[in-house]
Amino acid sequence: GMKKKNQGLKQKILFTTLTVLALMAAIVIGLAYKTITDSMHEQTRDYMEKQCKLFLSILDNHYPGEYGIGQDTSGAYFLVMGEEVISDEYDNLDRICKVLDVELSVFGRDMRLMTTICDENGERVIGTIASPVVIRDVLDGATPTFYTDAEISGIERFVYYEPIFTQNGEVIGIDRKSVV
């Protein structure tokens, strides 16, 4: 009887030790995963920031003048740079985004005025309003912001927002890149 009892105790101790080891392994894997994820997120953020700056510099080179928001007779808003309406200039935008494999939107204040994102009917998703979080962080906070869990059209994406400033330092809009 005594021998059997000891064996049961040994098995219990062994099982407990294995459980602790398994738990430690899970925690270590969790931490490693977080570290890998963090560095991946950082790389993704850097990559997206460069793409935003590239796109904005292409616009700057192509259209002299300052960003502005106009309104047509129907009340619809549009994006201007200098004298040019740019929110319907999609040739370059679509080509760049296809090559880089990203989606891009430009917001005037909080409204999406230019985008490569299309709905299920193939129509560009124009006129939608940025989320309250984005308005707070990017427009009001005037800060470039990277989100790792933004949902757009039901797909989770990495999203990077870059505020667009007027010459007097006011935030006029947001340049937004998203990567699936």
What are the functions of these language-model segments?
Residues 48, 158-180:
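Short, hydrophobic beta-strand elements of compact beta-sandwich sensory domains
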Residues 9-38:
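Extreme N-terminal signal-anchor transmembrane helix of membrane signaling/transducer proteins, especially
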Residues 82-101, 116-154:
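Extracytoplasmic/periplasmic sensor domains and loops in membrane signaling proteins
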Residues 46-68, 91-114, 144:
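Short N-terminal helix-loop-first-beta-strand/juxtamembrane motif that initiates sensory/input modules
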Residues 20-21, 33-57:
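Juxtamembrane membrane-water interface segments immediately C-terminal to a transmembrane helix
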Residues 1-2:
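Short, Lys/Arg-enriched N-terminal segments with co-localized hydrophobic residues
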Residues 64-84, 107:
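Alpha-helical transmembrane helix bundles of large polytopic membrane transport and channel proteins
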Residues 6, 156:
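Beta-strand residues that line the small-molecule/cofactor-binding core
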